[in-house]
Each structure stands twice: as C-alpha cells, then as structure tokens.
Amino acid sequence: MIDYDKINEYVARVKELGMDSAAITDHGVMYGVIDFYRAAREAGINPILGCEVYVAPGSRFDREVGSGDDRYYHLVLLAENNQGYSNLMKIVSKAFVEGFYYKPRVDLELLEKYHEGIIALS
C-alpha cells in the first residue's frame, strides 16, 4: 500500500529509475488511484491501477465469529483496461457494502461476476 500523500515522491522515483509504468494497489480501497493516475500521466508514466483485496474464505456475507470465516486472504487485482477499472470499482464497492466484516471482503462470486478486464496476481 502506498500513502497517497507520497504519490508524487513515488512517481518521481519511478521516473528517476527510468521505468515507463508503475502500479498502485491500496489494501481494500482505491483512495489513491485518481491522484496517482494524474501524477503518473503528468510525468509520462503509464499508471497501472489496482487493489489488494481481502478474499473471504467462504461467502462475503458470512459474519459468524469463530467459524473461521473471520479470516481473509490477500489478492492483488490490476485493471487491464477501462472495463477492468469499472469492474474493480464494483468489486471494491461491494466489498464495503456487502462484505465488510473487520475488513472489506470479496468472495469468489464477486470475482467471477466482475472478472472481465482484471488481472489477478498469485
């Protein structure tokens, strides 16, 4: 996760290292993507937008303490294109509205429904 107050420093360092692309993957949120996108574009850097989502072991709707469903796993998702960005926003929004249990969680159902244009890292 990158602190969005440090985005300009991050982009400057990417430029200094001669890289032409860089990604941002906040944990469970996408608060920094707009600022990062603007700063990267201004610097001639290709911005790759993403999110490190929390994946529930079962359903995102499960809330029973001690059932093992209070755990979660990390998964990095990157938007490959505009459709992917739109789907990533839907996934993250639904994680908060429908899956929030200590953290905003997604499940396989959400990932299957909104997979188009998304690159998942393992």
Residue ranges and their predicted role:
Residues 1-122:
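Phosphodiester-processing cores and adjacent nucleic acid-binding clamps
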